[in-house]
Each structure stands twice: as C-alpha cells, then as structure tokens.
C-alpha cells in the first residue's frame, strides 16, 4: 500500500493528472480538507479548481516518505518537500473504501528542523 499511496501523492504534482478533473474527483474524498502552508483551509472543490488550472508539472520532489497504517484501511503519510530554500513538512491521510483509495486530509507546514533528505 505504501508504494501505491506514494505514487498517488506524486500524481498530484504532475500536470497529466492535475489537469484531469475526473481523476481528481476519483482520488480526492468528498469530505477532503487541506490546510496549506499559508494557514488557509481548502475544501475539495477549491483544490480541484486550483490544480486543474495549472499548465505544467509542479517542480516538487518527495523526501523522507513514511506510511503508517493507523486504522482499518486508513493510512497516515508524512513527507518533506522543498519550496525554494524552505522545507515543507506534509501530512496526508488516505483511506481505502470499497476498493478505492482516496485522500481525505492534507496539511503543509513550514519545517525549520535540520534534516537529512532522502528522495523517494
């Protein structure tokens, strides 16, 4: 499951998937909530709108990825990305229900700790 979720997270940075509203509706849960590094809260429809208007891949790499099963078919994801010189600590919650895997929560926070980055 870890590799599947890693690929789903990566897909949210790739133009071919971000521009596919049907795909985004399929992997983003209707109750999805995101708290961006700006501190703003976003819901599913806002995220889909914002992603679908991008015209190219987001230049983001994933570092220090971890995946923990925290409930029956619920997975807690942590990883770091870089934005300019800043490290961004990201947390997502994914669930598998009726054979479908969907993201239900995501948060991005500025991360000031020194850390060795391992790319995934």
What are these regions, as identified by a protein language model?
Residues 2-18, 31-120:
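A beta-strand edge to alpha-helix "cap/lid" segment located at domain peripheries
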């Amino acid at each position: 499951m870890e590799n599947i979720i890693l690929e789903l997270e990566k897909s949210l940075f790739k133009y071919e998937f971000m521009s596919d509203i049907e795909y985004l509706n399929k992997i983003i849960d209707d109750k999805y909530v995101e708290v961006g590094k700006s501190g703003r809260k976003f819901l599913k429809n806002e995220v889909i709108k914002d992603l679908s208007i991008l015209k190219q891949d987001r230049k983001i790499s994933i570092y220090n990825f971890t995946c923990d099963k925290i409930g029956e078919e619920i997975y807690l994801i942590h990883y770091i990305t870089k934005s300019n010189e800043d490290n961004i600590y990201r947390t997502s919650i994914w669930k598998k229900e009726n054979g479908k895997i969907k993201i239900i929560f995501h948060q991005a926070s500025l991360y000031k700790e020194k850390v060795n980055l391992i790319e995934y």
